[in-house]
């Protein structure tokens, strides 16, 4: 079907060379915003070549004359007079007094530079409006319902061109989580768009929606994103829109996954006639507990909705396995026109579906410092659990969700904003956005702020090279030394992956025997940049993802964070059926020493470790008696980046001796039951009158043995007793 090409009459003309389809002209910029930027907004310049602003506190303000405005994120935007890059000297949560409006062009907000646990915005929206060339990376935006008057989106891009959002986590909006309207040349990639508040405080009622996209003369690209736990609009398309929807993962939608508006719903702004275009390629849709339309991915609203589809997987059976299939046009409903070819020049890469699925979960969202909210979302998608939510609060019990009655309506409350570590930013003497240790290692002058805009061989400035390094997984290695890296912690905390490492540059890398740590060894006398590659195998599905590039800075300063070390543990012994207790000890060689956190490296049933104290407890199953078991534990520090170490514990599990039971008669109706065994295990005494049906009469874990129990056994018939170990 190609006749539709003649109906396009609008033009967008910018830049110096163009791709053309029909009468629509679209600029193709040769320099991506950063390595890995794709799609319509990939050419955004951001703050390239401009000044640098440091966010030094988590405050916000209302009045433009407020003396506390200096050092805030809001003032970093408001005071920009030209290209600017905003970096962070503090991590934590910023409670917005009102919507944070990004209305300045040529601006980069580099959330990946925040120390500690990164940056979260809450209470109000992040709005990018009336701007061009904006880059926003590695932020969390979780407004919630703290402000009873708030009815907005989490993130809204409106009347903009050349904007890219990368690795942004958005949730708990009252309207849509992330919307783009009246804009063109916008990319939303590697973002997690999750848990819009369904029955909240919107004046239209239930409004748990993902994205509203409409009114733009150019192209929008949504690539490699997660949509999870929205009632609908995953996304919703309006008039005058061309959307590349590629390699996204949709999970647990409610009434509808995605759909298009129609002539009537978008009538106010479609005087020229309703039209939209959708390229729906390489997506995965998985129905969840809240899904009511498990077999439909997208519903068209008019014949002027033109759809091209290719290689999409739909898993609607809710059987707990990842076994989606491509049902072709069968997953599309409503009214629309099919396209046999991509409706405009294709520039966005398409990843194989299973690899795209894993990459979204492995490295998507604000994954550099993945908080407990995103970790919980990850587990709900992996385990095919979770639910739509209505409000943010603290459940009274130790759980993630709680149903409460509010004004006669049952609402699902979700656990709210986690506390975030502020961290400590590295020294930056010239305040050019690049730490001193970085500048020294790569041959820049830490006392000359002008070198931040020096162009490199790949077309990026020196500052952009640093920002791009910080945006991916990264480690620091000492000169003439080595560093051990825990890949599990570095790459998002996803259990159930087997790692593979590949050769990189300026160093050698080896996967250690525990399968999750690598050792990188720097070449003798070298300082500067290196890297290595990591791929992963998901053990549950057999699918592979990667490789992912891990950047290494070989430093000439003492900026490296040394890993902690465990104190030796002797051979441990425990009786089966009892609890092994041991306190782990570790030290940190850094000055000053970092705070240490202990954890279980390889999960075992009944095994736990207190994070702050290292107190280990393991309730040993009776069935393991007479065996030798291995436990794996780990410790990590609070440095930047966090370093860790693992330790193997060997446990000899002694078998429980067979207990003995004796019955001494006291008188005609009373007996004394005597139990001989060992302290610790649970014993079960059972009674029978026919040696076939046995009934438990007592379960005990006596403090001392032998243990005596008085039995009254009425009736003339025989009674039999036996003893066994509780399972």
List the predicted regions and their residue ranges:
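Right-handed parallel beta-helix
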Residues: 106, 110-111, 132-143, 159-172, ...
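Surface-exposed or secretory-pathway low-complexity segments enriched in glycine-proline
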Residues: 481-521, 548-552, 567-569, 574-583, ...
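Short, solvent-exposed loop/turn segments at the edges of extracellular beta-sandwich modules
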Residues: 537-544, 636-643
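Extracellular beta-strand/beta-solenoid scaffold signature
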Residues: 122-126, 148-156, 172-180, 201-214, ...
């Amino acid at each position: 079907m190609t006749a539709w090409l003649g109906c396009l009459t609008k033009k967008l003309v910018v830049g110096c060379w163009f791709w053309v389809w029909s009468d629509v002209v679209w600029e193709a910029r040769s320099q991506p915003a950063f390595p890995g930027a794709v799609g319509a907004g990939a050419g955004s310049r951001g703050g390239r070549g401009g000044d640098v602003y440091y966010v030094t506190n988590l405050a916000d303000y209302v009045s433009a004359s407020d003396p506390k405005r200096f050092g805030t994120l809001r003032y970093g935007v408001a005071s920009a007079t030209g290209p600017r890059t905003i970096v962070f000297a503090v991590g934590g949560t910023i409670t917005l007094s009102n919507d944070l409006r990004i209305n300045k062009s040529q601006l980069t907000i580099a959330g990946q530079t925040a120390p500690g646990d990164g940056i979260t915005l809450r209470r109000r929206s992040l709005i990018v409006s009336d701007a061009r060339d904006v880059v926003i990376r590695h932020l969390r935006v979780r407004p919630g319902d703290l402000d009873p008057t708030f009815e907005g989106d989490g993130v809204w891009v409106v009347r903009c061109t050349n904007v890219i959002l990368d690795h942004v986590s958005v949730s708990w909006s009252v309207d849509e989580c992330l919307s783009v309207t009246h804009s063109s040349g916008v990319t939303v990639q590697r973002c997690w768009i999750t848990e819009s508040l369904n029955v909240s405080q919107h004046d239209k009622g239930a409004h748990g929606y993902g994205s509203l996209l409409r009114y733009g003369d150019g192209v929008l690209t949504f690539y490699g994103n997660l949509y999870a736990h929205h009632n609908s609009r995953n996304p919703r398309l309006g008039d005058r829109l061309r959307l590349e929807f590629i390699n996204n993962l949709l999970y647990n939608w409610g009434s509808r996954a995605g759909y298009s508006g129609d002539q009537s719903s978008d009538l106010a702004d479609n005087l020229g006639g309703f039209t939209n275009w959708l390229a729906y390629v390489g997506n995965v849709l998985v129905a969840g507990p809240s899904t009511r339309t498990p077999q439909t991915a997208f519903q068209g609203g008019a014949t002027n909705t033109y759809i091209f589809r290719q290689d999409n997987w739909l898993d609607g059976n809710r059987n707990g396995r990842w076994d989606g299939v491509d049902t072709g046009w069968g997953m599309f409903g409503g009214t629309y026109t099919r396209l046999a070819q991509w409706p405009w020049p294709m520039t966005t890469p398409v990843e194989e579906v299973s690899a795209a699925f894993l990459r979204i979960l492995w490295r998507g969202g604000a994954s550099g410092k993945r908080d407990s909210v995103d970790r919980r979302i990850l587990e709900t998608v992996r385990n095919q659990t979770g639910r739509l939510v209505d409000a943010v609060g603290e459940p009274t019990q130790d759980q993630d969700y709680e149903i409460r009655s509010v004004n006669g309506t049952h609402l699902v409350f979700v656990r709210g904003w986690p506390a975030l570590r502020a961290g400590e930013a590295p020294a930056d003497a010239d305040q050019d956005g690049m730490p001193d240790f970085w500048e020294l290692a790569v041959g820049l002058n830490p006392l000359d702020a002008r070198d931040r805009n020096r162009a490199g061989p790949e077309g990026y400035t020196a500052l952009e090279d640093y920002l791009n390094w910080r945006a991916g997984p990264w480690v620091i290695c000492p000169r003439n030394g080595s560093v051990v890296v825990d890949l599990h912690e570095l790459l998002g905390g996803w259990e159930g992956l087997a790692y593979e490492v590949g050769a990189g540059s300026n160093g050698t890398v080896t996967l250690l025997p525990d399968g999750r740590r690598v050792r990188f060894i720097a070449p003798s006398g070298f300082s500067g940049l290196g890297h290595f590659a990591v791929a992963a195998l998901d053990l549950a599905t057999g699918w592979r993802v990667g490789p992912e590039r891990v950047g290494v800075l070989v430093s000439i300063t003492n900026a490296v964070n040394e890993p902690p070390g465990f104190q030796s543990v002797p051979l441990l012994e425990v009786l089966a059926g009892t609890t092994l207790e041991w306190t782990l000890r570790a030290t940190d060689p850094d000055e000053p020493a970092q705070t240490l956190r202990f954890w279980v490296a390889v999960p075992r049933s009944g095994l736990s470790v207190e994070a702050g104290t290292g107190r280990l407890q393991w309730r040993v199953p009776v069935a393991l008696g007479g065996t030798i078991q291995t436990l794996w534990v780990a410790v990590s520090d609070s440095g930047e980046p966090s370093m860790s170490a693992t330790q193997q514990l060997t446990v000899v599990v002694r078998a429980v001796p067979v207990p003995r039971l004796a019955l001494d008669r006291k008188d005609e109706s009373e007996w004394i039951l005597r139990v001989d065994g060992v302290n610790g295990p649970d014993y079960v005494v059972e009674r029978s009158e026919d040696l076939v049906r046995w009934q438990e009469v007592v379960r005990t874990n006596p403090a001392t043995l032998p243990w005596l129990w008085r039995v009254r056994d009425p009736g003339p018939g025989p009674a039999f007793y036996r003893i066994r170990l509780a399972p």
